[in-house]
Amino acid sequence: MNNNLLIIAGPTAVGKSDLSVDLAKKLNGEIISVDSMQIYKYMDIGSAKISKEEMGGIPHYLIDFVDPSKEFSVAEFKDLTTEKIKDIQSRGKLPILVGGTGLYINSIICNMNFAESDKDEEYREELEKIANEHGNEYLHEMLKDIDLESYNSIHFNNRKRVIRALETYKLTGKPFSSFKAKNSIYETPYNIYYYVLNMDRAKLYDRINKRVDIMFEKGLLEEVKNLKAMGLTDDMQSMKGIGYKEVLYYLDGKISLEQCIEMIKQGSRNYAKRQLTWFRKDPRAIFIDKDTFASEEDISSKIINDIINS
């Protein structure tokens, strides 16, 4: 059984879904979403979730399965995705990761070791109590004897990180900093083909702006109203996503609808810029400038030829 893994990444609204479905059909593949918003149920419009029709009969995984009131970690994503990759490969098919969440992608192809996966809520509460009674600096000093590297690198006012470092040592007996050091950036068990779609910035930004307008036409306001009625609030992980937090501001009377729409467009454009910056850090990523290809078919052919001839 081969260990090939195809990745189609890129900024929001660049057109990853259509290309990936076409490739899946031609390469006998199945798709695993690597999008930190499309994991949530009931959040279809604001996350630009792919529809059943758009899936074109290709199985898609890790979409629409997490309750938006729940937290979901990168470590959980890694575990689920690793199992799904094995499952797809065991059936003689090609797993294709598709999306724009760089940290999710790196959790799979950088062989990252997550100390984040284990929690001790009781100990966390105990540490919170210590910090409340004695101050953040007192809590920070507790790190000094067990993890000097974290003590030096984590500011004493970053209480959440200090607590995480102390908790990790209690759970594993190892310094929090040692887990970070084991993140081997380019070590992966897979034979990866990693492509990042891109296009002229002005064109991309225009696509982003139009996508936001379409979201409102499709009923983004109603979607967020329903989520709010379900008890979801702006301090929850799911509701911090672009498009959701801004509509909550509008529904709470903090901003006008016009301001809401413009904030979503600006936030999405800024996010696209950050995504591209992230992907450029990995020398294994092959950038595909869509403007230099006559059609999607040509892009698809280029990727297929790369895989066949490698």
UniProtKB/Swiss-Prot annotation:
Residues engaged in binding substrate: T12, A13, V14, G15, K16, S17
Cofactor (UniProt): Mg(2+)
UniProt KW keywords: ATP-binding, Magnesium, Nucleotide-binding, Transferase, tRNA processing
Recorded catalytic activity of this chain's protein: adenosine(37) in tRNA + dimethylallyl diphosphate = N(6)-dimethylallyladenosine(37) in tRNA + diphosphate
Family: Belongs to the IPP transferase family.
Oligomer and partners: Monomer.
Protein name listed in UniProt: tRNA dimethylallyltransferase
Gene symbol of the encoding locus: miaA
